[in-house]
Amino acid sequence: MLIIQGESQCGDVYLKTYRQGAEVLLAACDCDLMGKRFEDGKLHLEVCSDFFGTEKASCQDLEKALPRVTIANFVGKKAVDKAIELGYINKENILVIDGVPCAQMVMM
């Protein structure tokens, strides 16, 4: 079971932004997860630079980017905790794969 408490102590995350028409997607993951693969039954998660990028950013950068995006993917405790702290994700909607929290957001 994953327990997320209090204000996050966010360190470095990888951020990558994609634009397709009016949609802006942000991919955010904890730096320590890059290049790793996680499995939990039928669920598989591969954290790769092709999707999450190679540019390290701070959680302040993540916070500044979120108001401009319409879709976001968060992987890892730091990224997910920050999204919860800012009100973009509800704790109840987190998926945990092999101990790694993941969440998605879509603005409608």
Identify what each model region corresponds to.
Residues 71-108:
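Short, compact, well-ordered microdomains
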Residues 2-63, 67, 107:
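Conserved mixed alpha/beta catalytic, RNA-binding, or beta-rich assembly cores of soluble enzyme
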